[in-house]
Amino acid sequence: RVWRQRHQIDAITSLNRRLAEAEREGEMGQSVVELREAAEHLLVDSPYRQVFEENLLGIDAGSHATELVVALERGYAEPDERARALIQREVVRTGLFIAASPYPALDLLLVAWRNARMVNGIAQIYGLKLSFPVRWRLYRMILQNMAFASATETVLDSASEGWASNLLVNLGARAGQGVAVALYSLRIGRQAMRVSRIAPEQRPLVDRNLARLILGSIRERSAGTK
C-alpha cells in the first residue's frame, strides 16, 4: 500500500513535468493520446473522475498538448477552489495562533504539525489518500520544492512589493510574527496544490489577492484583540 501511494505521487510529478514539456514543445498526435491515457489512469480513483472524463472526451491524435492541459485544468476547477478555501482558513488560523501566542518560538513545532495537516487535507481534496509515511514524504518534498523556488515565484514577493512590508512595520512584534508564519504556510499550501495536480500550473494557484485577503484578516483580528 505504501509503495503504491509513493508511486502515485512520483507518477503525478513525472506526468506534470512531461505535460509541461509537451506543451512547451507544441506536441500533438500519438504522444498527446498517450499523455491523456496516462492522466486517465492516474485519475481513476479521483472523486472528480467523471468530470475529467467529460473534459477529456475530445482529446485525440488531432489535439495539441495545450488542449489536453486546458481540458485537465477545467477538471481541476472545483478541487482547486476547495483547496484555496482550505488554505485560506488554515493559514489565517495559524497566523492568528502565532500572533496571540506569548511563546511563538516554542509554538513553531505546532505550526509545522498544522501545516502538515493542511497538506494532507489538500491531498485528500485531489483524491490522494496517503498513509503517514507517504504524507511525511510529501511534506518533505514540498519543503524541498520551496527551497529551490526562485525568489520571484514566492507568494511573499508577489504579495508584498511594499504592502506587506508596511503591514509588518505597523503591527506589533507578535502580530508581525503571525504574518510571517502565515506567508510561509501560504507557500506550503501552494506547493501542496502543485504536487497534487497532474496539470502544470497555468496561472498562479495562489495569487496576490488571496495573500492580501489572508494578511488583511490577520491584521484586522490582531487589532481587535488589542
What are these regions (language model features)?
Residues 70-116, 131, 135-148:
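Transmembrane alpha-helical segments and their cytosolic interface motifs
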Residues 124-183:
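Hydrophobic alpha-helical transmembrane segments and adjacent short intramembrane/lumenal linkers
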Residues 2-16, 116, 193, 197:
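Juxtamembrane helix-loop transition segments at the membrane interface in multi-pass membrane proteins
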Residues 173-226:
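Acidic, carboxylate-rich catalytic segments that either coordinate divalent cations
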Residues 5-99:
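Membrane-proximal, non-transmembrane interface segments of integral membrane proteins
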